[in-house]
From Swiss-Prot:
Pfam families: TAF1C_beta-prop, TAF1C_C, TAF1C_HB
Subunit composition and interactions: Component of the transcription factor SL1/TIF-IB complex, composed of TBP and at least TAF1A, TAF1B, TAF1C and TAF1D. In the complex interacts directly with TBP, TAF1A and TAF1B. Interaction of the SL1/TIF-IB subunits with TBP excludes interaction of TBP with the transcription factor IID (TFIID) subunits. Interacts with MYC and RRN3. Interacts with p53/TP53; the interaction prevents the association of SL1/TIF-IB with UBTF and represses RNA polymerase I transcription.
Organism: Rattus norvegicus
Keywords: DNA-binding, Nucleus, Phosphoprotein, Transcription, Transcription regulation
GO molecular function, one term: RNA polymerase I general transcription initiation factor activity
Residues recorded with modification Phosphothreonine: 808
Source organism, top-level taxon: Eukaryota
Protein name, as recorded: TATA box-binding protein-associated factor, RNA polymerase I, subunit C
SUPFAM superfamilies: WD40 repeat-like
Record-linked InterPro entries: TAF1C (IPR038801), TAF1C_beta-prop (IPR049087), TAF1C_C (IPR049089), TAF1C_HB (IPR049090), WD40/YVTN_repeat-like_dom_sf (IPR015943), WD40_repeat_dom_sf (IPR036322)
Length: 842
């Protein structure tokens, strides 16, 4: 482990080397006097960096990641959003914008939905004033209330539903007795605890530090094109899956068989793998447990040790030097080292932060290039600790402050050693904050070798350094944010050379960019799919490139347990230019602009769309229906078992009549169980209805032509339907007159028959035949609704004086009936005087 041959003053750059005019030496802390003035960079270094920046580009084969395995059987809850925490009212006298948590609504909902949990501890305090059995107790000093009647009143009380719900005297007495206890003790205690929980949830919503380091790992297999993915899944992420994956010549992965899994007692937060001297180990961190397995390619994983962390584990790492060595750090500031030979030993303990005070209990530990030196980090900085030295001995490697030109409020989020297991180990460490990344050399503490503002909108908690695609190529560094954003950086410089960025970073597509590959769904299902794709990313892994598969295969794990993959390949124009052939010198620009992709834009293939469709079908089959909310009920059957509920024999109608007669207010408990109404049948939509045809024509752009044709058809059908109706009415009227005038004996036969019958036996008075004939003729010209009224009116008219009918010539009869039709008034035969025109509307 030698120092670099030359220490240039351009160790710290505002951007990648070769993309800026000169170094930024606005700060150099204690090294300012030791370093010389800035000098010109060597031509070969500038040319080689420029060739990296111009030629090395990775392009994705698809516009977004694709699902690798089907979704898990357990449902996934997206959790609470920002609008669920914030206060939605107005803020008066507020001079600066700040986040206000809505504790009042959350507390009221908690007391209403979980009253048994909130008020159960207060039972002993209120026991002396309440009696569970029997009637109310009489005492001059202590007021005792019967719980049976009280719960019966509470069972029908609806403070939020019915505005006319009346309060009984027992409820008022209960409010007086329990007011001091319920209003003060519960509200103060629960309010304080709930506010702490809301503050913790709000911090987790902004940045969930539990998945720092990532919960996804790639284990190399027997060949370069095969491997194994280790990741958690399930509703609680408590199942550790081992999935065999093979990579074909085109770079697409293929799942070999059903994955094996291990059931754990807690959620998996971090997965770390390491291969030392041919032995592969797997370490898993949960909230309060850590475990180590030995991985064999032919046998199932064998557990080595399970450790319990009382204060909660925050970080775990495997040694790249010694097989089986494990470093664990907890929230109490303790760092422990576990080995198969010596067991567990404490190497560092400090509850305080390194540089300045910070309330975060997060701690981190990792190894260095020296086997007996570890790094211990918190939000304020990173410190190197010698295990063999005295307690508290160490050297500060990084400090979040003016030494590193940090911004206000900038904190350390991840500290990772970039060395790989093997003889060619490096001394570089990656420090990630919410604004920038730093490359630190442990041989030069407190002096950043490289700084870059990553610009990620979410916290970068995931980082993976991969081997180069070919000899002489820079090493790709993957930087992942919790929101799903992934950046690809190229780190050049090994051994004694200075580390540098070979070109600006590349932003890779996120999981949410794959939404366009899925088929369009109804709005509710589309929202479920979008929420699933927007789940936070908790794992990042990659299959390293090799000679047989030069492409890069990137895997991402979401909080829902879904694994997505994306294939990256180097562009055909990307190649390294030898430093012996310098490029023409060009003026460097201040701002490092992102490269412009000269290649073709990737598009979705039919194979990718089919894979997304199959994954979506499996997801829709597993999506559960939302539970129907039901109002809470009060029951006293648990502690009042001997009291049976009274069953009323009265029907619902009788109860309603009695309540209306007395003027009482009915409660839901008085009516009993109401019958549930069956949902109406869903309307069956025909495929050939008018609306479907209209929408189809509108979608094809022929809405105007369809509407004109529809108007022509409607008007034509109306004209055709009106003309036959009018002709039918007129023809029936004239045909009735003609048929009656052509038959002169139509009225004589019935008259003679009626006369003979009347002489034989007495009969009640009837309507004369002429009147019946007149009624039938009238009924032909009157609407169907008024025919019965017309018959009743004709039946009420007086009969003739002579019992026998008077013969009337057919001509007079027809003229009389025609005149009656015109006047719409019946004309009777006989010597009766003419009647006035009736005023009944006929």
């Amino acid at each position: 482990m030698d120092f670099p041959s030359t220490l240039r003053p351009s160790l710290f750059m505002a951007g990648p080397l070769g993309m800026t005019d000169g170094p930024d030496l606005s700060f150099m802390c204690s090294w300012r006097d030791a370093l010389t003035l800035p000098g010109a960079q060597p031509q070969n270094c500038r040319d080689q960096t420029s060739s990296f920046a111009k030629n090395l580009l990775w392009e994705p084969s698809t516009p977004g990641p694709l699902p690798l395995v089907p979704p898990g059987p357990d449902p996934w809850d997206p959790g609470l959003a920002a609008q669920d925490f914030l206060f939605r009212g107005g803020h008066y006298y507020q001079y600066q914008s700040r986040v206000v948590l809505d504790v009042t609504e959350q507390l009221s909902r908690f007391l209403w939905d979980h009253g048994d949990i909130a008020f159960a501890p207060l039972g002993k305090l209120m026991l002396e004033n309440f009696r569970l059995e029997g009637n109310r107790g009489y005492s001059k000093k202590v007021t005792i209330v019967s719980v049976k009647r009280l719960l019966q009143d509470l069972g029908g009380h609806q403070p939020w539903g019915c505005p006319w719900a009346s309060l009984s005297r027992r409820l008022r007495r209960f409010s007086i007795l329990g007011g001091p206890v319920l209003s003060r003790s519960v509200s103060l205690l629960m309010g304080r605890l709930l506010h702490e929980e809301l503050a913790t949830r709000w911090e987790q919503l902004l940045m969930d530090e539990a998945f720092t380091g990532g919960a996804l790992a790639w284990l190399p297999g027997r060949t370069a094109r095969a491997g194994q993915l280790v990741y958690p899944s399930g509703g609680a992420l408590d199942k550790l899956y081992f999935q065999e994956v093979s990579v074909n010549s085109g770079g697409n992965p293929r799942v070999l068989e059903d994955p094996g899994h291990i059931q754990l007692r807690g959620p998996v937060r971090q997965v770390v793998t390491s291969t030392v001297q041919g032995e592969t180990l797997l370490a898993v961190r949960s909230d309060y447990h850590c475990a180590v397995w030995k991985i064999d390619k032919q046998e199932p994983p064998a557990p080595l040790q399970v450790l319990q962390v009382e204060k909660g584990a925050t970080g775990i790492s495997l040694s790249p030097h010694l097989s089986g060595e494990l470093a664990i750090c907890s929230r109490s500031g303790t760092v422990c080292l576990w080995t198969p030979q010596d067991g567990l030993q404490t190497i560092y303990k400090d509850p305080e932060t390194l540089a300045f005070r910070d309330p975060s209990p997060w701690r981190w530990a990792d190894f260095t290039a020296h086997p007996r030196v570890l790094t211990v980090g918190d939000r304020t900085g990173v410190k190197m600790v010698d295990i063999q030295g005295p307690p508290g001995c160490g050297l500060l490697l990084f400090c979040a402050g003016a030494e590193a030109a940090c911004q206000k409020g900038e904190r350390v989020l991840l500290a990772q050693y970039l060395g790989q297991p093997g003889p060619a180990s490096t001394s570089l460490h990656l420090i990630c904050t919410q604004f920038s990344i730093y490359l630190m050399d442990e041989r030069l503490p407190l002096v950043p070798m490289l700084k870059w503002d990553h610009g990620l909108p979410s916290a970068p908690l995931l980082a993976r350094l991969l081997p180069p695609a070919s000899p002489g190529y820079p090493r790709p560094l993957l930087l992942g944010g919790q929101g799903g954003q992934v950046q690809l950086l190229h780190i050049a410089g090994e051994g004694t050379s200075i580390p540098q960025l070979a070109g600006p970073p590349q932003s890779l597509p996120s999981i949410t960019d794959s939404l366009s590959a899925f088929p369009l769904l109804e709005p509710k299902r589309q929202q479920q799919l979008q929420e699933r794709l927007e789940a936070p990313v908790i794992g990042l892994a990659a299959a390293p490139p090799c000679a047989s598969a030069p492409g890069l295969l990137l895997f991402q794990l979401s909080a829902a347990g879904d694994v997505f993959y994306q294939h990256l390949r180097i562009q055909q124009t990307s190649s390294l230019r030898e430093p012996d052939h310098p490029a023409p010198e060009r003026p460097a620009s201040r701002a490092a602009a992102p490269p412009v992709d000269q290649g073709s834009t990737p598009s979705w293939t039919s194979r990718a769309s089919a894979r997304c469709s199959r994954w979506l079908e499996a997801l829709m089959e597993l999506s559960p229906t939302n539970p129907v909310w039901a109002a809470p009920t009060f029951s006293h059957r648990r502690f009042l078992g001997h009291m049976e509920r009274q069953k009323s024999q009265e029907t619902l109608a009788q109860k309603l009549q009695a309540a209306m007669a007395k003027g009482q207010l009915l409660r839901p408990g008085d009516l009993g169980t109401l019958p549930k109404a069956e949902p109406p049948p869903a309307p069956q939509c025909s495929q050939q209805d008018e609306l479907t045809e209209r929408l189809t024509k509108a979608w094809e752009g022929q809405a105007a032509a369809w509407w004109k044709r529809h108007q022509d058809q409607t008007s034509g059908s109306q004209r055709q339907s009106k003309r036959p109706k009018r002709r039918t009415q007129l023809s029936s009227t004239f045909s009735s007159f003609t048929s009656y005038m052509d038959s002169p004996d139509a009225s004589s036969a019935p008259h003679s028959q009626d006369l003979s019958n009347s002489e034989a036996c007495p009969q009640p008075p009837r309507t004369p035949p002429s009147q019946e004939l007149t009624q039938e003729l009238w009924a032909q010209g009157v609407q169907h609704e008024r025919r019965q009224t017309l018959r009743d009116y004709m039946a009420k008219l007086p009969l003739q004086d002579n019992p026998g009918p008077v013969a009337t010539p057919p001509s007079q009869t027809s003229s009389r009936q025609t005149r009656s039709f015109r006047q719409q008034t019946p004309v009777l035969s006989g010597s009766h005087p003419p009647r006035k025109k009736p005023r009944m509307g006929f």
